[in-house]
From Swiss-Prot:
Coiled coil: none annotated. It comes from Novosphingobium aromaticivorans (strain ATCC 700278 / DSM 12444 / CCUG 56034 / CIP 105152 / NBRC 16084 / F199). Belongs to the peroxidase family. Peroxidase/catalase subfamily. InterPro entries: Catalase_peroxidase, Haem_peroxidase, Haem_peroxidase_sf, Peroxidases_AS, Peroxidases_heam-ligand_BS. It is an enzyme of class 1 (oxidoreductase). GO terms for biological process: cellular response to hydrogen peroxide; hydrogen peroxide catabolic process. This is Catalase-peroxidase. Homodimer or homotetramer. GO terms for cellular component: cytosol. There is a cross-link at W116-Y238 (Tryptophyl-tyrosyl-methioninium (Trp-Tyr) (with M-264)). GO terms for molecular function: catalase activity; heme binding; metal ion binding.
Amino acid sequence: MRKFSVSKVALLAATMAPALLPAAARAEGTAAPAATAPATPMSNRDWWPNRLDLSPLRQHGVESNPMGGKFNYAEEFKTLDLAAVKKDIEALMTTSQDWWPADYGHYGPFFIRMAWHSAGTYRTADGRGGAGGGQQRFEPLNSWPDNVNLDKARRLLWPIKQKYGRKISWADLMVLTGNVALESMGFKTFGFAGGRADDWEADQVFWGPENKWLADQRYHGDRKLQNPLAAVQMGLIYVNPEGPNGNPDPLLAAKDIRETFGRMAMNDEETVALIAGGHTFGKAHGARKPEGCVGVDPAAGAVEDQGLGWNNKCGKGNAEDTVSSGLEGAWTANPIAWTTQYLDNLYAFEWVQTRSPAGAIQWVPKEDATFVPDAHVKDKLHKPIMFTTDLALKTDPAYRKITTKFRQNPDAFADAFARAWFKLTHRDMGPRWRYLGAMVPAEELIWQDPVPKATYAMIDAADVSALKGRILATGLTGPELVRAAWASAASFRGTDMRGGTDGGRIRLAPQKDWAANNPAELARVLKALEGVATEFNRAAKDGKKVSVANLVVLGGNAAIEQAAAKAGVTVEVPFTPGRTDASQAQTDVASFEFLKPAADGFRNYYDASANRLSPSEMLVERANLLTLSVPEMTVLVGGLRALDANAGGARHGVFTDRPGTLSNDFFVNLLGMETKWQKAATDGVYEGLDRKTGKTRWTATPVDLVFGSNSELRAVSEVYGSADANAKFVNDFVAAWTKVMNLGRPS
């Protein structure tokens, strides 16, 4: 699955061993590796740091994919013997390797942590992170302080990946292995879906403003966390297990937990289930002080290290001498079995503060309670441990209520953990049609943004033609139809595959009320289209029906065809029916609010109060979320301006005397030297003055003018502004428009 960007160690539910922050990492003064060597030539970005960065629109190209552009991972996965893969993974669980021995003779907890940390980077604000793409293989995630020693987990898995090759991606294999780990230790999971294609390069993701591991410049005011971030410090998945910035205050830790897990789409019950369920298994590793023992992370390693990092030169370097998170110990007496011991121990003892051998703050029973077996040394026993973040589950009133309920009702605990684990590992996959394999659960879940299956016959080509005529006969204008269709489609995010035209949620709260969507105008358009649908469905034969979701797109198509004809180009905009109308009950309003556009340069919309990036940067961000290339972004902006499709009917960037005609006038008039541009009295607006008369010809925003000021965008704009470009412009616009209208649908 492709991930896009512009621009969560511990708690780690990781079950098992929150990969800590070796002391080396815990020290806030530890800087991240330098991005470039001193001898590296200056890049254009170095010379001109304020230059608009278009690279997000060029990542994950087919050129970087060794499988080639025709490779279809979904089809390969369908040929996979999933039962055989699971059998091989289960055998691996108890086949301990001398180079990295399994704790308690079972790799299950280790692999749960791997899967958790693969998926746990997901964040709701922009849909980035998550298990899709297998990004844990690449920098920076493969070298985050929170991911210490997970490089070994993936190396343990390599023989299985090697065996099944292209039939299973690393992204799917890591999640599946986490599931099998749970099942092999007696837990019944909710299910598993394949379908996560691998990425072949690191995502360009804004993980925070800091340039040092574990720094936290992401906060401002009264500990307000910067959007879209969902972790407390650079290099952590969620929170610091020792407490906020190492402050061992469970109540303050609870605040961080609630915010970070909430930004990963988890409510209080799901959060408690994940932490308590995860810490039922395995142990944390902090047998020695990292300084003087633990080497550099994988990305900073020498070529002979072959991508393995954090090499430990003290003692055995592994087993009972392992250093990962820096915390040390297990939560239960049976860390490789599903039990309620974590919750029982949490409430059974009075916990007192201590430090691990690595120096990390943790908690042990005040009582004489030495009953936890050592993971490697026979007959050696330890006290159970808790993190500050564990004690938060008993100290915080809301969390205490939930842990008490789970302790009294183990079945409810198991069910909550199973569901939360499934959500954690599948949240970024998008609609259910992308789920593959025999283990996909039948139950439909609200966070999957469900859409109903069609129970009627689809419209055919003749119906499409007739419906376009009916739509145009409603009296709705071309710009109104285009704006409604774009508002529906542009909600899509390629990061987590949410939004888009399917489901017709443009009719529902919250989308119908978003300022960018012109609510009053949109309501009028939808009322007219609903009338067309009602009339057609009442009269249609052969069981045919048409959804409003389809009509919204079809209306935009009809308007574009009409506008192209005005420009002298005959074109038929491709249309594929199949969209159905979701209900309000199928729509989680709070969840969908994260899709609300704070900016959409394609319709010249920008809310300055809600953005950390400039209008032009937010245009690139929107294009990135829509999986567009630089040329596609360019032609769409030019076309939408010509179609007079700005939000609220604003005139900025409508560089034409014939708005509503699909002409290349935007580019012709922007590139011509007849106009001189200057800042207007209104902030963020520019005036285009006739060089001869001094009269104002046009007004514009930075989003409009960047296509003339940025050298790369100007080069593309010149293609579309040429005298022979009108037909190419229309055809390219139609192709890009059609792509956007179909985002989030089966290809």
